[in-house]
Regions:
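Bacterial N-terminal signal peptides
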Residues: 6-15
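N-terminal cap/lid segment of alpha/beta-hydrolase-fold proteins
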Residues: 20-43
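Short, surface-exposed "cap/lid" segments of acyl-processing enzymes
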Residues: 38-73, 77-80
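Alpha/beta-hydrolase active-site loop
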Residues: 87-108, 127
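Gly/Ala-rich beta-loop-alpha elbow adjacent to hydrolase catalytic centers
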Residues: 116-125
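Active-site nucleophile loop of the alpha/beta-hydrolase fold
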Residues: 143-154
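The feature captures the conserved acid-bearing segment of alpha/beta-hydrolase catalytic domains
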Residues: 153-204
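C-terminal catalytic histidine-bearing segment of alpha/beta-hydrolase fold enzymes
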Residues: 207-242
Length: 242
């Protein structure tokens, strides 16, 4: 009887903890740490590759991806915690991004794509854009950097999960400056007190900087975060020049 009661309690608890979005493990390779958020309806909206923060596929990554998915954009979530637990190089990361795009552009029938990164993932964004083969760069409609810092190490450091003032060995600003015409969005929190925020340093015409309420995680308001992106990036059915 005691075992039956324990089983019943476990079932009741699990019923209240089911995720709002039916995310699925990615199929490209277990080495990449992918999560799939597909959509059922055909649409001209692009697919999204979402590079997570160093905490892995966590609350902000899930929350914003659910918003993107709800608006017709299938998402491939890429866990930085899994992938960068061992150090990578920009070239390695780009090669694996190409693997992801080759698989999902075909499977989901979406050639156009949007690149989104949060925190650690945001710092990777300009590096991989600058190293993409032309065909994949040409199908990229824009990129979003959420709470990026001025440098990355392409490797997870546990201390960085607590303190966001790291001095990485790969500066992000020169990489952003090398992207001349692709629409870029840099989003920061008004209360983010990190001394190494990237957004205030970005002045080029193809970069839009947005400041939202909250700190590093934008008060967990994923609807406002989604709208700040959707209102500023041309990701509808219109083809974009690069």
């Amino acid at each position: 009887m005691r075992a039956m009661l324990l089983l019943l309690i476990c079932c009741l608890v699990s019923s209240f903890t089911l995720p709002a979005v039916a995310a699925q493990p990615g199929r490209v390779g277990t080495d990449l740490g992918l999560v799939e958020l597909p959509v059922a309806q055909a649409s001209s909206a692009p697919m999204v590759v979402f590079m997570s923060g160093d905490g892995g596929w966590a609350a902000l990554d899930k929350g914003l991806s659910a918003q993107l998915q709800a608006h017709g954009m299938p998402v491939v979530g890429w866990s930085s915690l899994s992938y960068y637990w061992k150090k990578k190089t920009p070239d390695q990361a780009t090669a694996d991004l190409v693997r992801i795009l080759t698989e999902y552009q075909s499977r989901w029938g979406r050639q156009r794509w949007l690149l989104v990164g949060f925190s650690f993932g945001a710092e990777i964004v300009p590096f991989v854009i600058n190293r993409l083969p032309p065909a994949y760069r040409d199908s990229l409609v824009g990129a979003v950097m959420l709470s990026p810092s001025t440098a990355s190490d392409f490797e997870i450091h546990v201390s960085d999960m607590v303190v966001h003032d790291k001095a990485g060995s790969y500066p992000t600003l020169p990489e952003v400056k090398a992207i001349k015409s692709l629409p870029l969005l840099c989003v920061q929190g008004a209360d983010d007190d990190s001394p190494v925020k990237l957004c205030p340093h970005l002045q080029q015409p193809n970069v839009t900087t947005v400041t939202l309420p909250g700190s590093h995680h934008f008060d967990d308001d994923y609807g406002v975060l989604y709208r700040s992106i959707a209102d500023r990036l041309p990701w509808t059915g219109e083809e974009q020049d690069h």
